[in-house]
Amino acid sequence: MTISQLGRPGLFFLIAAFTSTILVACGDQQDAEKKVDEGVSPLSNQATPSNTSPDGVYWGDLHIHSRLSMDSFSFGNRMLSADDAFKFAKGEPIEAHTGDIAQLKKPLDFLLVSDHAEFLGVIASIIDRKHGIDETELGKRWKGWFEENNIQAILDEWVGTLDEASSPVGAEAQNIEYPPASFFNEVWRDMVDMAERHNDPGKFTAFSGYEWTSMIDGDNLHRVVIFRDGPEKTSGVVPVSSIESSDPEYLWARLEDYEQKTGGQVLALPHNSNLSEGRMFSETRISGAMVDTAYANTRIRWEPVLEMTQVKGDSETHPLVSPEDDF
């Protein structure tokens, strides 16, 4: 099966199904080995594998930030946009912010530019003097810090809006003025349109999505939200921000609203669970109630896949679980 037979729907299916298939296979193998150890012959599985599932392997990236993300812009990416990211993924040369020319040896099959939903595009708009954000109290304050090269003050205030416990400015940042919804609507539509312009069925899949950046007491509960659909459905919504709620159950409810209203499909990918101090898989919900069957069913409905590894760490295991693992 070729990538031309997949596009957004097929790749979305692969992303959702891949981890589940691995987990089921591992479980079956472990059960069989256990039965053999107990002296019981395992039963033969007479089921015939289906030929309808995609069997190709495709390479891409589901977590990358452009200058629209607060951290990316603050850490030095002042000019590279989602457009540059898509061009780079498709094998085109781009100029990095260092002035170097960068180009992949082999193009990717798909890409999602998952900018942070929280203050999406705000710092870039302030410095670019667009949308009038630079004339607000927030804009004037951040612009002043930027011109003083006090980037840390901007980051502290931004992180404080996500989690006061992990920011030096603490609760003060919780009262920060937030740009109007109309601003984020415009930024999001531009993001969706950009993905659509680069989406090339049969050659390259450009997903629309974002990162929901929840933190509680400094523990990372981030999710990457991935839409299967094009702008005819995704442009009518705006990214869900953890400033609205840091509870993943709130995010899942909003994703359900999207599917019910548009008939589209979306999933959430837990990101950097290795930085969650175990909270990503806690037996207690954010509300304080214990995890139950209904919660588990809801979570697997919206989060069928888990990010296993990336440059900021691995989430496959833990030193307490695998003390002999050298890696």
Predicted regions and their residues:
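Bacterial N-terminal signal peptides
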Residues: 10-22
